[in-house]
Amino acid sequence: MNSLPLHLLDQILFRLEPKSLAMMKSTNRTINSHISDPLFESEYFSRLESSLYNLSPGGARYVMCQPLVSSCKSMSMGEKAIQGNFRCYMLGSCSGLLLLYIGGLFVANPLTKRFRYLDPSGSKFIPTLSGDRWIYLAHPERAMCVGFAVDRKRFKIVCILEMETRYEFEINDGDSWRLSKTTINADSKSDLTKWMKPVYLEGTLHWLRNDGSIIAFNPETEQARLIPSGFHQEVPDMKLLLAADDKINRLTLISGTKQTISVYTLLGNLKWGLARRIKNVSLKENELNAGTWLCTMASVFW
C-alpha cells in the first residue's frame, strides 16, 4: 500500500472501523506514521457516527481513555484511573465535550485528547455526591442534578440545589464555583426525577420533576422558570422520560404506564400537546422499572 497515492490511501483507511484501523498501525512504519498524523485523525473521527459509552450506574472500573489510533507515550487518564482504583462516571456531554468524574471532576475532549481538572472544593453540591477521598460517587442517582452546557467554545457546569419547593443554582465556568442569585419556588413539593439527566435545548438546561413539571435554567442569563406539568396528579405506575426533538427543536415528554405510552410536545404557550399515543407492550409487573421502560421506549420510537 506504500505505492498508493495519498488521497487513495485515505479513502481506503476512512472506510475502516476503528478497531481495524488500530490494527493497521502494526503493518509498517509508513502507514503508522500516516494514521498518527493529526490531520488524518481529525478527518477520520469527523466521519464516525456517535458512539455510546456503556457505564454501569455504579461507575465503570475498567474504562480506558487511551485513543485507538494515536500513539500515547505517557499513561492515559483511564489507565491512571484503573491503577488508582477509581471509578469513571459520565455526568454529562455537550458539543463534543464530556464531563467526567474519575476521582474528581474533568472536562475532556475525546478528539484532541485534552482534559481540564476542576477543583470541587468550592462547591456546596459536588462533595455531597462523593464517598471517602473522592474515589467514587456515594450517591450516583443524585448526580443527575449536575448540568453541563457548552456554548461559544465556553462551558458551564450547573448544579441544582433542591430544598423542598425551593431551588438554587450553583455555577462553575471553569474558574470557580459560585451560587447564582437566581432562585425559584414551586407551588407544590415534587422531587427531581432520579437517574434522569437534564436536557439542554436552546441554551437552557431542563430538569424533570416526578409530577411532570420542569425546572428550566439558562446558564448565560441565569434566568429560571417552572414549566407546569401536563398531568393533574402523579400516577403510581407512570414512568416519565424527558427528551429534545431535534427536528422541531422542542421539548418532548414521554409518559408510560402498563396500558399506554403517550408522547407530548411542549407548545409555545407552555402547554403540552399530545403528539402520539400507543398501546404499551405487555410487561410483567416486576419488569416495569426505569431501565426496562427506557429500553422499550428506544425500541418503539428510535
UniProtKB/Swiss-Prot annotation:
Return the PROSITE patterns for the record: FBOX
Output the Pfam families linked to this UniProt entry: F-box
Ranges for domain F-box: 1-48
What InterPro entries does the entry give?
Answer: F-box-like_dom_sf (IPR036047), F-box_dom (IPR001810), SCF_F-box_component (IPR050796)
Protein name stated in the entry: F-box protein At1g20360
The organism named in the record is Arabidopsis thaliana (Mouse-ear cress)
